[in-house]
């Protein structure tokens, strides 16, 4: 959690954390903060992309799980992504301690292509 994702150095700090030796295969890095409107904003540095992406479903779910475990949110949260779109995450906890997450939001085709023979 950071004070304000809008001014966070997602590329620089994200790259540093992504390449930290603690994460042998690298890791995605999520930055989250309260928005002025009272909600939450999230930005993600993605491994493989090696930069910031407009949204990350797994990052949103992981962030919601952490916020929930820290007592920052209840079972449901909406996160405004770098694209400006909002994704919702619901965390359901069973009595035996199992957490199940569901993600909701808009999905879009952003690229189509054809691979030739390799």
Feature-to-residue mapping (PLM):
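Active-site proximal loop and beta-alpha junction motif in alpha/beta enzyme cores
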Residues: 1-55, 62-118
């Amino acid at each position: 959690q950071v004070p304000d994702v809008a001014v966070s150095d997602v590329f620089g700090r994200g790259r540093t954390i992504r390449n930290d030796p603690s994460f042998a295969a690298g890791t995605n890095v999520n930055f989250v903060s309260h928005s002025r409107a009272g909600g939450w904003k999230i930005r993600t540095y993605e491994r493989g992309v090696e930069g910031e992406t407009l949204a990350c479903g797994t990052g949103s779910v992981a962030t919601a799980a952490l916020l929930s475990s820290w007592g920052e949110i209840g079972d449901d949260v909406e996160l405004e992504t770098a694209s400006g779109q909002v994704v919702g995450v619901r965390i359901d906890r069973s009595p035996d301690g199992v957490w199940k997450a569901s993600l909701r939001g808009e999905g879009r085709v952003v690229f189509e292509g054809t691979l030739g023979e390799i």
